[in-house]
Curated annotation (Swiss-Prot):
CDD domains from the UniProt entry: TlpA_like_family
Highest taxon listed in the record's lineage: Bacteria
Biological role: Has an important function as a repair enzyme for proteins that have been inactivated by oxidation. Catalyzes the reversible oxidation-reduction of methionine sulfoxide in proteins to methionine.
GO cellular component term of the entry, any: cytoplasm
Gene: msrAB
UniProt keyword annotations, A-Z: Disulfide bond, Electron transport, Multifunctional enzyme, Oxidoreductase, Redox-active center, Transport
Domain (Thioredoxin) ranges: 17-174
Disulfide bonds: 68-71, 440-495
First-level EC class: oxidoreductase
A Gene Ontology molecular function term of the record: L-methionine-(S)-S-oxide reductase activity
Name recorded for this polypeptide: Peptide methionine sulfoxide reductase MsrA/MsrB
Start and end residues of each stretch annotated as Peptide methionine sulfoxide reductase A: 199-354
Organism lineage: Bacteria, Pseudomonadati, Pseudomonadota, Betaproteobacteria, Neisseriales
């Protein structure tokens, strides 16, 4: 507690620490005004949000969107929590952000939500997403805990269950990882699942406050966590790392969407903000804990990192001193270090985090791994086989009708010639000749290759009337079809989850057994 108070005072009065004394780079101070901003807003039923905000309680906020199926499936559960006496020690509210992150415009959202039946769910509307932006909320659902004094105490990305929510209210530093939850189906699934097709790399580049905040701003990064890596002791504290020579490096665990970013992309972003020739020093921070390094868990990544280092070396006369090593250990830093620059908007940082907003030149992508199929019969494999061969996201989407995040799959912006087949059975479904950029965030087509390859079903969920599209052979959930497509091409828009598909490039169609369909592409 003494150590935390020391850091709080330094953040408040601008102290320069002997260890971790960073050059000042002021970040968005909006996080400090979250309580005031909340109190000025109204709910979806036009009540003052202040009705739900008692000053003597912490506030637990759930951020959600109308286009997020997981969010919609949890509305009833969240409404029950808001009425449950177990949650009476906190203000429990939800925030929707019309006009932000592809949410409906304010009027359209109000009209849409009025058709739902959650009369006891506090839904505060923040037009433009001022609060979400100030807290770096980039995925839904996400949660934020605001203390009694108005300070941001914790941000959690993804779905949490009741036990986790209560633990968070009791202790902002609670270890939520020990309480299992499922991302897609929290009521039925028994094991954790990943938000997207995620991969993880560990980056050491000086003071982890700035590096964490920097990567949180990058589109395609799902999460960034500060911690201590590759040291000689277990479960070190900040004091251990700083004063007791444990050998750990301040490191950020970066989890990213591999369908949007490759490891090489991540490394390009990394080298933008570190001096790779500086040994045990970044900015004003000096010591072995501030050394630079890239630590991997997949041996195949060593060569990728080596190639990036070789390319980077060409920019410098001095030799690079960035470690390229396997991850030996990693321990999360104390909770007060997590999201530090959000909790302390005037805190110091040795890098310019605005560089995260600059696009990469020649951005590369990581292609999804291919899956096998029976080209002769297009039969659906057994459930055990599907769980073995599909990613968690592919399984949840095709088998449990889940939906991937909008703009999250590389197929949304893939327009190379070829065909798209059912990832489950290999059945041909759509051609690149019929694909177009609808702007909705999911791969869109004007028609299937063969009308008989898909089936249509009424879907009345979430106060909507939609037409679900499934594959014929394997009955895989694909997406929905809407009557708002290009008029000159039939007027239909097949809005399809990229996770349901496998792309076969034109030049590979013969070898893959689809040569007879090349005329559908050309």
């Amino acid at each position: 507690m003494k150590h935390r108070t020391f850091f709080s005072l330094c953040a408040k009065f601008g102290c320069l620490l002997a260890l971790g004394a960073c050059s000042p780079k002021i970040v968005d101070a909006g996080a400090a005004t979250v309580p005031h901003t909340l109190s000025t807003l109204k709910t979806a039923d036009n009540r003052p949000a202040s009705v739900y905000l008692k000053k003597d309680k912490p506030t637990l906020i759930k951020f959600w969107a109308s286009w997020c199926p997981l969010c919609l499936s949890e509305l009833g559960q969240t409404e029950k929590w808001a009425q449950d006496a177990k949650f009476s020690s906190a203000n429990l509210i939800t925030v929707a952000s019309p006009g932000f992150l592809h949410e409906k415009k304010d009027g359209d959202f109000q009209k849409w939500y009025a058709g739902l039946n959650y009369p006891k769910l506090p839904v505060v509307t923040d037009n433009g997403g001022t609060i979400a932006q100030s807290l770096n909320i980039s995925v839904y659902p996400s949660w934020a805990l605001i203390g009694k004094d108005g300070d941001v105490q914790r941000i959690v990305k993804g779905s949490i269950n009741e036990a986790q929510a209560l633990a968070l209210i009791r202790d902002p530093n609670a270890d939520l990882g020990s309480l299992k939850h499922s991302f897609y189906k929290p009521d039925t699934q028994k094991k954790d699942s990943k938000i997207m097709n995620t991969r993880t790399i560990y980056l050491a580049g000086g003071c982890f406050w700035g590096l964490e905040a920097y990567f949180q701003r990058i589109d395609g990064v799902v999460d960034a966590v500060s911690g201590y890596a590759n040291g000689n002791t277990k479960n070190p504290s900040y004091e251990d790392v700083s004063y007791r020579h444990t050998g750990h490096a301040e490191t950020v665990k970066v989890t990213y969407d591999a369908d949007k970013l490759s490891l090489d992309d991540i490394l390009q972003y990394f080298f933008r903000v570190v001096d790779p020739t500086s040994l045990n020093k970044q900015g004003n921070d000096t010591g072995t804990q501030y050394r630079s390094g890239v630590y991997y868990t997949d041996p195949a990544e060593k060569a990728v990192i080596a190639a990036a280092l070789k390319r980077e070396q060409q920019k410098y006369q001095l030799p690079l001193v960035v470690e390229n090593e396997p991850l030996k250990n990693f321990y999360d830093a104390e909770e007060y270090h997590q999201d530090y620059l959000i909790k302390n908007p005037n805190g110091y940082c040795h890098i310019d985090i605005r560089k995260a907003d600059e696009p990469l030149p020649g951005k590369t992508k990581t292609a999804p791994q291919g899956k096998g199929f029976d080209a002769a019969t297009y039969k659906k494999p057994s459930d055990a086989e599907l769980k073995r061969t599909l990613t968690e996201e592919q399984y949840q989407v095709t088998q449990n009708s889940a939906t991937e995040y909008a703009f999250s799959h590389e197929y949304d912006h893939l327009f190379k010639p070829g065909i798209y087949v059912d990832v489950v059975s290999g059945e041909p479904l759509f051609s690149s000749a019929d694909k177009y950029d609808s702007g909705c965030g999911w791969p869109s087509f004007t028609r299937p290759i063969d009308a008989k390859s898909v089936t249509e079903h009424d879907d009345f969920s979430y106060n909507m009337r939609r037409t679900e599209v499934r594959s014929h052979a394997a009955d895989s959930h694909l997406g929905h079809v809407f009557p708002d497509g290009p008029r000159d091409k039939g007027g239909l828009r097949y809005c399809i989850n990229g996770a349901s598909l496998k792309f076969i490039p034109l030049e590979q169609m013969d070898a893959a057994g689809y040569g007879a369909l090349k005329s559908k592409v050309k």
